[in-house]
């Protein structure tokens, strides 16, 4: 490999996998009631350095559907990817791990959630697309405002 190729920025998804998945229907009585669910959706992301050039990025979602005051189902999915990240400016790393990689993972997470819910014999559940770039920028602004407020 030439020296120029060794210094070129590299960013690639090398492995995509479901790290954790569960689906629970606490009671069969939910199937006898009219379906008008209230959804509680919690989404989070995390990143872990595996070695100098590889990171595991994970998106986790927990969805709890309540119907007529009872839990209809709980679905918990963690979708992960191993990303090769090399020769990238250090100041770009938070954006890549906090927005770029989650944008890649989200469609797979969304599909896994929908599959679990429909296999549980509930109506389709398609999570609304998320703009992780905008979320990342908003988090930066909140952090900067908090720091300025302490000064």
UniProtKB/Swiss-Prot annotation:
It is found in: Cytoplasm. One of its GO terms (cellular component) is cytoplasm. The keyword Transport applies. One of its GO terms (molecular function) is unfolded protein binding. Homotetramer, a dimer of dimers. One homotetramer interacts with 1 SecA dimer. One of the proteins required for the normal export of preproteins out of the cell cytoplasm. It is a molecular chaperone that binds to a subset of precursor proteins, maintaining them in a translocation-competent state. It also specifically binds to its receptor SecA. This is Protein-export protein SecB.
